[in-house]
């Protein structure tokens, strides 16, 4: 009995052929096979994606510059759930901003990673919108919104809500222009 089989031997035995299509192999390629991003629908959509990526890069660099102070800032927002939620949210924000970049910059990644990256781009704008609404509608005496961490103070107000909506529009426009799911013909 040969205990060490090659990957091609294993693939031959685990590939299901349905209507002439290699189902298992085709469906599993979404996880591991890096592919190039398809061309954007318009030049403007590509430029919007680059602009949103530049904004996220500035955000994440300034937030990571003083990450411990960024977490303390989120803690001062008095979010429901207290300190653990603030720390978790801070980590989710930074990780989402970083992982949204492969989709926006059209990097060569697997199709699944491209979809996850696109969704994280939406999540970033949604989190910032919720935080902006929370700080604007509650009576928290906070002097910094946190877009740029604690490096540059940006006072919360309705402008932060509008800016967060603008981030959502950029994410939606980039998603429309760089839509990663190909149609079957």
What are the functions of these language-model segments?
Residues 65-84:
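Membrane-interface interhelical connector segments
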Residues 75-76, 85, 116, 144:
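Residue-level detector of alpha-helical recognition elements and their boundaries
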Residues 1-65, 69, 91, 95, ...:
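Extended, low-polarity transmembrane helix blocks
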Residues 80-96:
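Interfacial helix-start motif at the membrane-water boundary
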């Amino acid at each position: 009995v040969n205990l060490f089989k090659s990957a091609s031997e294993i693939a031959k035995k685990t590939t299901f052929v349905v209507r002439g299509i290699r189902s298992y192999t085709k469906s599993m390629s979404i996880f591991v096979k890096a592919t190039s991003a398809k061309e954007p629908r318009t030049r403007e959509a590509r430029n919007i994606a680059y602009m949103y990526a530049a904004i996220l890069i500035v955000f994440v660099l300034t937030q990571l510059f003083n990450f411990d102070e960024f977490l303390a800032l989120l803690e001062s927002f008095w979010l429901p759930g207290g300190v653990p939620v603030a720390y978790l949210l801070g980590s989710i924000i930074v990780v989402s901003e970083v992982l949204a970049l492969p989709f926006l910059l059209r990097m060569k990644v697997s199709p699944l990673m491209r979809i996850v990256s696109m969704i994280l781009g939406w999540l970033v704008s949604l989190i910032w919108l919720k935080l902006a609404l929370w700080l604007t509608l509650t009576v928290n005496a906070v002097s910094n919104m946190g877009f740029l961490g604690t490096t540059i103070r940006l006072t919360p107000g309705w402008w932060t809500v509008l800016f967060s909506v603008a981030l959502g529009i950029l994410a939606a426009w980039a998603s429309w222009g760089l839509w990663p799911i190909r149609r079957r013909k």
